[in-house]
Design a protein with these regions (language model features):
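Catalytic phosphate/metal-binding cores of nucleic-acid and nucleotide-processing enzymes, i.e., regions
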Residues: 1-143
Length: 143
């Protein structure tokens, strides 16, 4: 368990540095409460806009993410009124980013004036590579 926890912590730090370098934002800090509370997410990016859930695993099931990872990311983001993002990587494969479709197609974005969509078609997952993910973040963060 300790090795997997260390692997997760290391991956969160790696992503934090990536966001700082690629997006020019202050390095997102790890959410230490995540070890004591459920639905906390791993990193927060963009003044409480994106809640990042990071997953780093050795074995790949075709390079695709596990549905329970996406469910975890959505649940944590909904609890804090943020946009969920799942970032995952299997050994010897590149990072993949999973966004809800409303981040890519704003027509799905309108839920109500006080929050982001949390269910339905607006939450359909869209998987992109790192280069596209950074473009998406830049659009939303208005850097």
């Amino acid at each position: 368990m300790t090795n997997s926890r260390n692997k997760g912590v290391s991956y969160e730090r790696e992503l934090s540095k990536l966001f700082e370098a690629e997006l020019g934002v202050e390095r997102p800090q790890r959410r230490l409460e995540q070890t004591r509370e459920v639905d906390m997410g791993d990193l927060v990016l963009g003044d409480d806009l994106f809640m990042i859930e990071a997953k780093r695993y050795a074995a790949s099931s075709g390079g695709w993410f596990r549905p329970e990872w996406w469910a975890q990311a959505k649940s944590a983001a909904a609890k804090h009124n943020m946009i969920p993002v799942l970032v995952y990587r299997y050994d010897r494969l590149p990072n993949r980013f999973v966004f809800p479709i409303f981040v890519i197609q704003p027509d799905y974005c309108v839920d109500d004036q006080f929050g982001w969509p949390t269910e339905g078609n607006a939450m359909s997952p869209v998987v992109v590579d790192q280069e596209v993910a950074m473009m998406v973040f830049r659009e939303w963060l208005v850097i």
